[in-house]
Amino acid sequence: MCYVSAGGCPTAFWGIEGGGRFMKKQWLLLMIILVLGGCDMQNRFLYFPNDDRPTAAMLASENMAFWRAAGQDYRGLISKENEAATSGTIVLFHGNGGTAFDRGFYLEPLGNLGFRVILAEYPLYGGRPGKVGEKSFVADGLETLRLAHEDYGEPVYLLGESLGCGVAAAVARQTSVPLAGLILITPWDTLASVAKSLFPFLPVKLVLTDRYDSIENLKNFPRNISVVGAEHDEILPIRHAHQLYQSLPEGRKRMWVIPNAGHNDWPYYADASLWKEITDFVKK
């Protein structure tokens, strides 16, 4: 350890030669630690998986059923009431907290508008096997979308909520299924942008292993996109939704801001007229 005196520390330690090498090594070591630990750091703040598989009694209480179940695995949940959908099918990717079962509140308003809604479940959520991460979620989402199209045909739409917007955007870019439109609720622009606002002192591009770059993924999306933001979003400040919206192709986008709503309570502020406007736009 060097104790600073009036004359300063020896040049061999702090000088241009020795000190420069020392500081570079320290920064290099810090970068290595951040990069090697990046996946763990990212996953701790981004994913909250659980093994709470819905029971038969739970599903019956909400009039839901497993969709595309195979052994102990399943792709998602579906309402028993809207099998004969007149408006098409919506594949819905939920946020990073909770499970598909917790998103039953989507079924009634969208079902009333004639949509069949598949509440897609992620790997390692809701008792499903697999692992978390963008690569895993997007690959799983692509297969879920393919199967939905196989089962029900067109039109098929994607709806993303929070993290699910990033999944939906990536799926929309990579799929060969002809999508009719896209709905994004409380979205971000890029994961790096969100991480930078949360951790301004970290080199987030080195730490992050997932990208979820919705700006890049949607820049050539050919159909209409409805973007819905919450005015008082305390988790993903609404500026991220605005930044994404500004980047989207002109003439094929529309944005709604739900007054007084936060990131998690916005459903209480979304009435039937809002749902109709949002879905009517993507149906054009």
Please place each PLM-identified region on the residue numbering.
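Short beta-strand/loop motif that positions the catalytic acidic residue
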Residues: 221, 227-229, 233
